[in-house]
Amino acid sequence: MMKLREIAHSRTGDKGNTSNISVIAYHEKHYPLLLAQVTSARVKAHFAGVVEGEVVRYELPNLSALNFVMSGALGGGVTRSLALDAHGKSLSSALLDLEIEDAPNP
């Protein structure tokens, strides 16, 4: 097992009560691993208790990236939330802690 951060980096954005996280493979060869193991269901489970709505995954193969749009993730949004991280920027780092299976050695 390894952490997602070993093969990818991430960026976070927000709009209202919705957060989106892009997960970008460092190398194109790791994109199939992202596709297979970083599913909407796994992301939703990883953020249990944080994300109240659905998690939708968008695939960006030309960028070797995935984008997850998570509804109900920001406690009502920046203007309504009392959270220290109202924009949800720390969610990207938290997602990179997701455990995935090691890439097979060629």
Task: Give short role names for the model-derived ranges.
Residues 1-106:
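Long, contiguous binding/interaction regions
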